[in-house]
Amino acid sequence: MAEVKVPELAESITEGTIAEWLKNVGDNVDKGEAILELETDKVNVEVVSEEAGVLSEQLAEEGDTVEVGQAVAVVGEGQVNTSNDSSNESSQKDEAKEKETPKQSNPNSSESENTQDNSQQRINATPSARRHARKNGVDLSEVSGKGNDVLRKDDVENSQKSSSQTAKSESKSQNSGSKQTNNNPSKPVIREKMSRRKKTAAKKLLEVSNQTAMLTTFNEVDMTNVMDLRKRKKEQFIKDHDGTKLGFMSFFTKAAVAALKKYPEVNAEIDGDDMITKQFYDIGIAVSTDDGLLVPFVRDCDKKNFAEIEQEIANLAVKARDKKLGLDDMVNGSFTITNGGIFGSMMSTPIINGNQAAILGMHSIITRPIAVDKDTIENRPMMYIALSYDHRIIDGKEAVGFLKTIKELIENPEDLLLES
């Protein structure tokens, strides 16, 4: 017998929530095979068995919070003996039948119940789903899942709701996973549990707001030259780099690296009474997912070319949306860039990420009239950029200079190529 324990994840992560059991009691388990998915403050991770055998016991249920080092399952040798559970179920059913009225205990009804019990045993469902179904008298054969092979507790709960609600409210409940409260039917509301990650994000954002002297400075960038360069080079870039597209994010990433080298205070953090200035350039790129905004890091951007940065950004975005990010993708960055422009934002004051000193905000490119010299006004594609920074570390002079460096490099992309 071997216990499966929650592994060490990251220095800042001490616990997680069991999001989903991937194996049921009685399933064969290979060495190194994942048996459950754990939701942490940063990413979802799979917990694997270090031994081959049969999953003989689940020590926690879906939704339970478990700590690092805590045993969550037992993997044994050979086949699991489920006769005790089966006999207990059988005896409970027999006791229930003895208490039923004569009308309910006719042979045909009993035969029907036995058939239903056998049918439920053949259906692939999690232990929590079976317990909930037995407790509430739900026939698992009438429960439809969410597109996978295993019925789960929420599938059973949704099936219960569907029997008492209209088709419209059923669809709404299944899509949102929430519970509607109707104390005042004319003012309906929906109450739902926040996910662990959203609760953590809310806590961290509040901590940043309360524990830093955050200030934001703005500038504007004429995107004419970089857009022209991208237009001229994008087809050749795709051919030269196996289909990788040239976007604006790589330009801003390289510009940020150059500005960080010029203004190292922006690449720092406070640790107690010390200020730590980072000598590396791991740039976080904010990615929007169904679970909210995630910030994986592109490592060593000072050593990567434009194509390598674009490829890594694309790979991290796919991993984020497929919930495949690892903890190594999410920790120990030095600076973050967020692009609210993809959602149509014209201007914003982004919030600093974690222990970093600053964050760069990109926004929508909007064509508007600009005075290009004393006597000439032209329509130019313009972008507002913002730098939110911790005023305890960074003075206004450095913040303005940093943003001005970004502006100059983007407006003169040939200089940016030379910087690289």
Curated annotation (Swiss-Prot):
Q: Identify the stretch(es) annotated as Disordered.
A: 75-199
Residue ranges constituting the Lipoyl-binding domain according to the UniProt record: 1-76
EC number(s) given by UniProt: 2.3.1.61
Please note every region of biased composition (Basic and acidic residues).
Answer: 91-102, 149-158
Q: PROSITE patterns from the entry?
A: BIOTINYL_LIPOYL (PS50968), LIPOYL (PS00189), PSBD (PS51826)
Named cofactor requirement(s): (R)-lipoate
Give UniProt keywords alphabetically: Acyltransferase, Lipoyl, Transferase, Tricarboxylic acid cycle
Q: How is the cofactor bound?
A: Binds 1 lipoyl cofactor covalently.
Identify residues that carry N6-lipoyllysine: K42
Give the reactions, separated by semicolons, that this protein catalyses: N(6)-[(R)-dihydrolipoyl]-L-lysyl-[protein] + succinyl-CoA = N(6)-[(R)-S(8)-succinyldihydrolipoyl]-L-lysyl-[protein] + CoA
Pathway participation: Amino-acid degradation; L-lysine degradation via saccharopine pathway; glutaryl-CoA from L-lysine: step 6/6
One GO BP annotation of this record: L-lysine catabolic process to acetyl-CoA via saccharopine
Compositionally skewed regions (Low complexity) per UniProt: 159-174
Q: Bias category Polar residues: which stretches?
A: 81-90, 103-127, 175-186
What does the record give as the active site?
H391, D395
Q: Does the keyword Transferase apply?
A: yes
Peripheral subunit-binding (PSBD) domain mapped to chain residues: 124-160
- A single GO cellular-component term on record: cytosol
Q: Which GO terms describe its molecular function?
A: dihydrolipoyllysine-residue succinyltransferase activity
Q: Which domain of life is it from?
A: Bacteria
- Give the InterPro entries listed for this entry: 2-oxoA_DH_lipoyl-BS, 2-oxoacid_dehydrogenase, 2-oxoacid_DH_actylTfrase, Biotin_lipoyl, CAT-like_dom_sf, E3-bd_dom_sf, PSBD, Single_hybrid_motif
> How does this polypeptide assemble, per the annotation?
Forms a 24-polypeptide structural core with octahedral symmetry. Part of the 2-oxoglutarate dehydrogenase (OGDH) complex composed of E1 (2-oxoglutarate dehydrogenase), E2 (dihydrolipoamide succinyltransferase) and E3 (dihydrolipoamide dehydrogenase); the complex contains multiple copies of the three enzymatic components (E1, E2 and E3).
**What exactly does this protein do?**
E2 component of the 2-oxoglutarate dehydrogenase (OGDH) complex which catalyzes the second step in the conversion of 2-oxoglutarate to succinyl-CoA and CO(2).
Q: Which NCBIfam families does the protein's record reference? A: PRK05704.1 (NF004309), sucB (TIGR01347)
Could you identify this protein by its name? Answer: Dihydrolipoyllysine-residue succinyltransferase component of 2-oxoglutarate dehydrogenase complex
Question: What does the record give as the organism's lineage?
Answer: Bacteria, Bacillati, Bacillota, Bacilli, Bacillales
- Gene that produces this protein: odhB
